[in-house]
Amino acid sequence: ADATASGSSALDTLMGAKIIAPDGGGDDAVRSSVQTYYGETLQTSDDLKTSACCTPYDLPKRIRGILSNVPDEVKAKYYGCGSPTPQGIDGLRVLDLGSGSGRDCYVAAALVGESGRVTGVDMTDAQLDVAKKHAESYCVETLGYDSPNVEFKKGTIEDLAAAGVEDESVDLIISNCVVNLSPDKPAVLSEAWRVLSSGGEFYFSDVYCDRRLPDEIRSHPGLLGECLGGAM
């Protein structure tokens, strides 16, 4: 289906019921709630109140090896729910939607090699600070590259153009337990469609539900932050 058809009922159904903004606000109130949760309420994955994020799963041997060299601070502030980064992506241009502390970007930086490029987009300053803090040392000292092949940009995943992501500029998009947090999920898919090059692919891990969520869950700031309030 054409992901630009953001108003289609089929796409809206796929994306689940719309998040109810805390305190009756709009989309900006939802984003503000998410920023507060991931920038202030959570300091490490130990602070999570549910198992929706960071559900145990087996990782490929190569990914485990790469993760062993990722800085501890980056891993401590990881709140994903899977491993959306495929292997065999040498030389590709990768975009991570809602990159957080950068864990998956660091993994991708190793997988694409020095000729590849990885960009992470996130809206939370506290997470971006951690991601940027270790990028150069990780790429140059740990991976042995001449210069970093990963960068992080501030922006929302519903408006990648504002973050400077151009049309058909990436070969692979990844996203780890983030689309559920968006107040406008059709816009996320529309932007993904726009920035992917011809033949590009979108890999994501996220939270789904098998029934309609009650308003009490869709409007609860804590459950939104824990990836339940916006489950698809």
What residue ranges belong to the model's regions?
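N-terminal auxiliary segments of SAM/dcSAM-dependent transferases
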Residues: 3-57
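A short SAM/SAH-binding and catalytic strip from SAM-dependent methyltransferases
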Residues: 171-184
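A short glycine-rich, Lys/Arg-flanked "PGG" loop and its adjoining helix->strand segment in the class I
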Residues: 186-201
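Conserved alpha-helix/loop element of class I SAM-dependent methyltransferases that forms part
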Residues: 53-93, 104-111
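A short acidic, Gly/Pro-enriched loop at the edge of an enzyme's catalytic core
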Residues: 159-172
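Class I SAM-dependent methyltransferase SAM/SAH-binding core
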Residues: 89-97, 101-160
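Short, glycine-/aromatic-enriched active-site segment of Class I SAM-dependent methyltransferases
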Residues: 207-229
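Helix-to-beta-strand junctions that scaffold the AdoMet/dcAdoMet cofactor pocket
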Residues: 113, 182-183, 196-197
